[in-house]
């Protein structure tokens, strides 16, 4: 989508955009339109960092009058605040149309041109509603429904790694959050540059931030390797909520205090949830629920932490050893 988004944004009549990682790639633009109004399209980029999405946002605002943006605030990217290389595609979004030809100078497109092919592989799909859906693909559906589904279908590398970690676990360590000793100023500057700047520059556009609820298992395993990770996430989320409170055209929504993330049956791996959560997120935006504020963020984070601590790894380990 880093390449395809250019044509979609330029050539289609949309005024509202879903932009995030794979966590919102299966959010229905049609459903968003029905629940929120507006003409929606999903232009999310799998595994995208904030600096990548900033390239897309800049182009969107140059091309369109934007009513609304739904943006996934992935906690992994939030606390890493790392840059991802964009040089091999960001020239598509500059003001020079002539250099766009560079994207076609590769074996794939040269072969397509020589064959005058109109196949989907060469020209893409016109069905923008399902173009980037992943949760309805057969190879993903087989992992939903319980941890036994993970054990039955081990092709996914992410699932293989989880099974390996649990199998090799000698003792079950409790979820202990190590206090953060480093500053988060770098992350705050990163968020200000690649995210808050757009909110401030475009006060007539509504920004809705979704915190994707990773499974409790993800946090338990992440804590073993990075014991201060959750402390950093808490500090940054509290700061983010405080900042959003000062921006009248932005809201942030959280779902980690629900029971949903307790059930691994809702996930195809450690972080990717089923489409019912995408619908719940749209409902929250439409109904004004699950909004995080300075008044409720402490209780929200405490509930989230308590649920992570209470998550029992023993049944999963026992199932592996059967």
Predicted regions and their residues:
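Active-site segments of SGNH/GDSL-like serine hydrolases
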Residues: 199-225, 254-258
């Amino acid at each position: 989508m880093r390449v395809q988004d250019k044509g979609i944004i330029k050539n289609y009549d949309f005024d509202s955009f879903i932009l995030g990682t794979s966590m919102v790639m299966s959010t229905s633009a049609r459903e968003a339109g029905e629940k929120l109004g507006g003409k929606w399209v999903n232009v999310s980029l799998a595994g995208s960092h904030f600096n990548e999405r900033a390239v897309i946002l800049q182009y969107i605002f140059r091309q369109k009058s934007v009513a609304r943006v739904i943006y996934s605030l992935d906690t992994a990217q939030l606390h890493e605040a790392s840059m991802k290389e964009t040089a091999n595609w960001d020239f598509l979004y500059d003001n020079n149309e002539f250099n766009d030809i560079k994207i076609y100078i590769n074996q794939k497109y040269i072969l397509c041109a020589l064959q005058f092919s109109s196949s989907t592989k060469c020209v893409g799909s016109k069905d923008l509603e399902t173009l980037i859906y992943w949760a309805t693909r057969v190879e993903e559906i087989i992992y939903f429904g319980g941890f036994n589904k993970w054990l039955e279908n081990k092709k996914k590398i992410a699932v293989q790694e989880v099974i390996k970690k649990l199998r090799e676990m000698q003792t079950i360590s409790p979820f202990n959050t190590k206090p953060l000793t480093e500053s988060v100023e770098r992350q705050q500057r990163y968020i200000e540059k690649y995210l808050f700047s757009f909110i401030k520059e475009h006060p007539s556009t509504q920004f809705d931030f979704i915190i994707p609820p990773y499974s409790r298992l993800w946090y338990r395993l992440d804590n073993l390797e990075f014991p201060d990770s959750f402390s950093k996430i808490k500090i940054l989320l509290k700061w983010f909520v405080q900042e959003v409170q000062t921006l009248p055209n932005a809201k942030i929504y959280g779902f980690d205090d629900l029971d949903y993330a307790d059930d691994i049956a809702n996930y195809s791996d450690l972080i990717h949830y089923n489409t019912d959560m995408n619908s719940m997120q749209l409902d929250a935006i439409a109904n004004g629920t699950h909004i995080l504020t300075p008044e409720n963020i402490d209780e929200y984070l405490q509930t989230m932490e308590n649920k992570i601590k209470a998550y029992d790894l023993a049944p999963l380990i026992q199932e592996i050893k059967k």
